[in-house]
């Protein structure tokens, strides 16, 4: 958000935005299961990244949540679609529309995390899961992953549309208010935009 505030974009890229959709594609296309190890915050874009991973293991001290609408941003592709698949439409809307933080235990109970354990055991557990996966047929795993991803591939197109919309939206006063408030550590005042 600081980069976006200071320069109007997310850093050097062809479009001017951080090419997060390319990162999403890499996570989905790598022909092996991916494991998100969450130790700290999985908020906003980090929350979407863990959703994109095939498995999520979290430290019991981890915090999850969305903050896009709070800072004048959104992920209307994988961030909404995969969340609704994981937790149900109503819960996904709650997570996005209210921008609350929730615990690793809540993430586990809602189906967003596969396992929660003490932070000092996280690295060892992720390694154990990876070692277990390495004993399995790589071709079978690849085909299984492709099968899971094919069912949600339409979210990629929606995400590309949303990414273009975000680029346009990021140039508005409303988006600037969200970014400025975030960087100034204050609540944004979006009252002037209620009629949109």
Give residue spans per PLM region.
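Terminal-region recognition feature
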Residues: 1-11, 29, 34, 135, ...
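A general structural signal for well-ordered alpha-helical segments in protein cores
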Residues: 20, 80, 89-92, 123, ...
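Glycine- (often His-adjacent) and acidic-residue-rich active-site loop
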Residues: 1-26, 42, 70-72, 153
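C-terminal long alpha-helix characteristic of the crotonase
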Residues: 57-63, 113-160, 171-173, 190-196
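CoA-thioester-processing core
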Residues: 22-29, 37, 43-97, 110, ...
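Well-ordered beta-strand positions
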Residues: 55, 94, 98-100, 106, ...
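Helix-loop "lid/cap" segments that line or gate small-molecule binding pockets
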Residues: 95, 107, 147, 151, ...
């Amino acid at each position: 958000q600081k980069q976006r505030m200071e320069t109007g974009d997310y850093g050097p890229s062809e479009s001017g935005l951080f090419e997060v959709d390319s990162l999403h594609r890499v996570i989905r296309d790598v022909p092996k299961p991916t494991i998100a190890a969450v130790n700290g915050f999985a908020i906003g874009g980090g929350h979407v990244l863990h959703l994109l991973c095939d498995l999520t293991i979290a430290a019991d001290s981890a915090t999850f949540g969305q903050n896009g609408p709070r800072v004048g941003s959104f992920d209307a592709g994988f961030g909404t679609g995969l969340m609704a698949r994981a937790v149900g439409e109503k819960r996904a809307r709650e997570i996005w529309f209210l921008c609350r933080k929730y615990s690793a235990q809540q993430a586990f109970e809602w189906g967003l995390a596969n396992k929660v354990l003490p932070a000092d055991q996280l690295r060892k557990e992720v390694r154990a899961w990876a070692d277990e996966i390495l004993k399995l047929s790589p071709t079978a795993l690849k085909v299984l992953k492709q099968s899971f991803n094919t069912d949600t591939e339409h979210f990629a197109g929606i995400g590309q549309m949303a990414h273009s919309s975000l680029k346009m939206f990021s140039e508005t006063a409303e988006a600037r208010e969200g970014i400025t408030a975030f960087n100034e550590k204050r609540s944004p005042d979006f009252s002037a935009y209620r009629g949109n």
